[in-house]
């Protein structure tokens, strides 16, 4: 396959992924012939089910119906959707980096890297929820400044930005660098096909990348990017998280230039 064809397929892949999210035809919500109000009045238990919701193109644009469906499914199945989102896009980001560096989309050990990215996606689903709820809980107390209680629907623009920054700051300060380092360890294990000890890993790291570049990405890119993400309405966060998954795969495959 020539490079132009591969590039066209890659572009189509990104467009298709975005379209699936924006026009997501499935939902995870109460479904019955009765309305939710009727179910409530009848005393029946209202439960969420995964079901086909169809595609209403006008509502997808005016009411973001597809994004809301996708958000409901993400909320209902956080680990499964976390695995798929990050595995699909971070792996693609890694392939994109390889395309830029070598001129080819071919990436070695693609399947194990896909699985590792997926496992990180599951971890992200848990960690981001922990930090978001944790920061909201201490906001406005002696532990941390900010609005209390924080209710997104009634919060002002600057309260949302402040909360987004607070969540982003603590997430990246505590979690980001160890996560990137652990991913580098997985890469070393996959590449060498054996267990890699801590001292061996540290000795192999490029000081310019891990002592400077990665730290700068946290301050210059990740904290601002996650501030925007956590400041957005929930329906838009799924799109932003998809873009950041792509960026993550791109950034974490940076290699030192040959002398």
Place the predicted regions along the sequence by residue.
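Membrane-helix boundary/juxtamembrane motif in polytopic membrane proteins
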Residues: 191-216
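Alpha-helical transmembrane segments
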Residues: 74-84, 159-177
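Hydrophobic, membrane-inserted alpha-helices
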Residues: 220-229
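Loop-to-helix transition at the N-terminal end of transmembrane alpha-helices
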Residues: 40, 70-88, 110
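Hydrophobic/aromatic-rich structural module bridging two neighboring secondary-structure elements via a short loop
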Residues: 99-128
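Transmembrane alpha-helix/helix-exit interface in multi-pass inner-membrane proteins
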Residues: 121-142, 165-193
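Alpha-helical transmembrane segments of multi-pass membrane proteins
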Residues: 10-37, 59
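Membrane-interface interhelical connector segments
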Residues: 134-162, 196-197
